Each structure stands twice: as structure tokens, then as C-alpha cells.
Amino acid sequence: FLIPKLYVFDDQNKALFFHSANEGRVWTNIHQNPKVCFTAYEMGCITPAKLACSFGLEYRSVIVFGSLSVVQDQTEALRVLQLFMDKYAPHLEANEGYLPAIPDELSNLAVYRLDIAGWSGKQDKRSMGMPGAFRYEATAGEPHAHG
């Protein structure tokens, strides 16, 4: 199965972490088979061309293979949840912009650790300096012309 997840990479442990409910599809599947693969990508600029099939895209992507396990240690789970806050809300301060996770909250969720067995990555570098280059986000939501 495939399911989108927010993640953090912990350089200290060379592992990826996710969190989810402590029941449901993810929980059931990893207990049946902990072998997983994970993918992440980042899209950059689009470079136009005269022919539609000649357009280019700047990107970076990675596919990771490994085993997923549930983090059992409460201190480690709370540390990982703080990594999520540091990554996704770096502009907020703990105890000012939000209250950090506490042990009681762990009863309703699971923190998962993906130990990396291997990975494969790919990228295509382009430049916003190329003629006509643009970012998709800049055009999202604009009406499209049909001729």
C-alpha cells in the first residue's frame, strides 16, 4: 500500500521518522511486514520549449528501502515529535507558539522509525536564469488558455 506522510530525517540516527495513529492500516501492515519503501521529491523550475514534449523540469527525488518499527521509548518518541516541530514550524518557539508534546499524548499515536537499508536518488538541475523558466507554484490557480 502507499500512503503520504510527513517525515523527518534524523541525521544523528540516519533514520526517517513518521507518526500516525496507533491503529489502522499503517499499524496493521507494519506488524505483518515491516519492509517498506519511501519516496520524497522536490520540484524546482520548469523550462519551456517550442515543443510540449521538450519542456524540462528541475527536480530531486529519492526512494528509500528499509524496515519500519514503532518507537517504544517515550523519551525518544517525544524527541522525534520535537524534530517535526523544528522542521515544519521552525518560526514557532516551544512554550510560546505551541505546547510541546507530553507523554500522555503518546497513548493515541505511534512514532515510526524507518531504518534505511538502501536508497536511490535522481536529480535534474536547471536554472531560473534560463529563458522563460518559471515555478509551477507561481502559476497554480491561474486560468488556462485553450485555443
Identify the residue ranges that each predicted region occupies.
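Short, structured beta-strand-loop surface elements
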Residues: N22-Q82
